[in-house]
């Protein structure tokens, strides 16, 4: 992963720094239009999907290695080479419990679609530190078009955000941004309302590498927006406490 694929998080593990990866799931309960680890038909995915589910002990051993030798370490469930980690929530739960038996500090993060609020609550109780939730849009209809949820709904995502926030966890949005959609005035208004409603701590601005004609054909066109930099600058003015970045931070 570190040498052939050039995965930055895999490199972090070997270079003893920052955020280490914890891929755990082979399956997913969404069919995102731009999935980077699994595609149907002739289109090739960027990554090969994880071929096995690790045991909690294996997850602990990787985390133990990273936490024992890195200052301000982060370990994250949910990677581009894997499916949705919450589909393996029992493995995650036991893994977090094992980690917290040895380490009271060190950030355990969950990159997720936040589809199972009951599992999110159990993980938070066990010692999860932070959660990064992926959305292509805060608008329900557009969310459904892109993510194609299977067996869950946008309401479940919102419930997970409420649960994690109520329990004092650090919440990031993994916002899949695309000029012509994210910067539209109606989308910005919905994003601002979303940030206020769920008290989001951080936006990770994830530039969506996708065919523009296919994407806008799926999501629909609208009035020309103000540009992504204008959106970011407006948010910095309106919500100065909101953090902006691209990677998961250490939160304790």
Please provide the spans of the model-predicted regions:
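Auxiliary Fe-S-binding modules of radical SAM enzymes
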Residues: 1, 189-252
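N-terminal [4Fe-4S]-dependent radical SAM core
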Residues: 1-22, 39-46, 65, 250
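Core AdoMet radical
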Residues: 19, 39-94, 98-119, 126-157, ...
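Local cysteine-cluster metal-coordination motifs and their immediate loop/turn environment
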Residues: 23-40
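Active-site beta-loop-alpha junctions enriched in small/polar residues
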Residues: 80-82, 113-115, 136-138, 176-178, ...
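Alpha-helix-loop-beta-strand connector modules within alpha/beta enzyme cores
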Residues: 89-105, 154-169, 222-246
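Catalytic cores of alpha/beta
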Residues: 118-123, 180-197
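Conserved strand-turn element in the central/C-terminal portion of the radical SAM core barrel
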Residues: 148-150, 160-187
């Amino acid at each position: 992963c570190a040498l052939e694929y050039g995965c930055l998080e895999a490199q972090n593990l070997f270079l003893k720094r920052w955020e280490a990866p914890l891929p755990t799931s082979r399956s997913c309960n969404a069919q995102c239009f731009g999935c980077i680890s699994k595609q149907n038909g002739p289109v090739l995915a960027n990554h090969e999907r994880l071929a096995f589910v690790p045991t909690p002990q294996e997850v602990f051993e990787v985390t133990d290695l990273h936490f024992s030798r890195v200052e301000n370490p982060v370990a994250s469930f949910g990677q581009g080479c894997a499916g949705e980690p919450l589909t393996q929530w029992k493995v995650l739960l036991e893994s977090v419990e094992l980690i917290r038996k040895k380490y009271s500090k060190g950030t355990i993060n969950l990159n997720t679609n936040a589809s199972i609020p009951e599992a999110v609550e159990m993980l938070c109780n066990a010692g999860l530190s932070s959660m990064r939730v992926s959305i292509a849009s805060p608008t329900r209809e557009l969310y459904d078009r892109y993510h194609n949820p299977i067996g869950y709904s946008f309401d479940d995502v919102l419930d997970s955000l409420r649960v994690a926030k109520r329990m004092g966890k650090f919440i990031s949005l993994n916002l899949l941004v695309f000029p012509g959609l994210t910067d539209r005035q109606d989308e910005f208004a919905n994003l601002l309302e979303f940030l206020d409603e769920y008290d989001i701590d951080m936006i990770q601005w994830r530039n969506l590498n996708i065919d523009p004609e296919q994407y806008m054909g799926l999501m629909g066109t609208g009035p020309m927006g103000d540009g992504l930099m204008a959106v970011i600058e407006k948010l910095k003015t309106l919500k100065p406490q909101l953090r902006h970045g691209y990677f998961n931070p250490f939160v304790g």
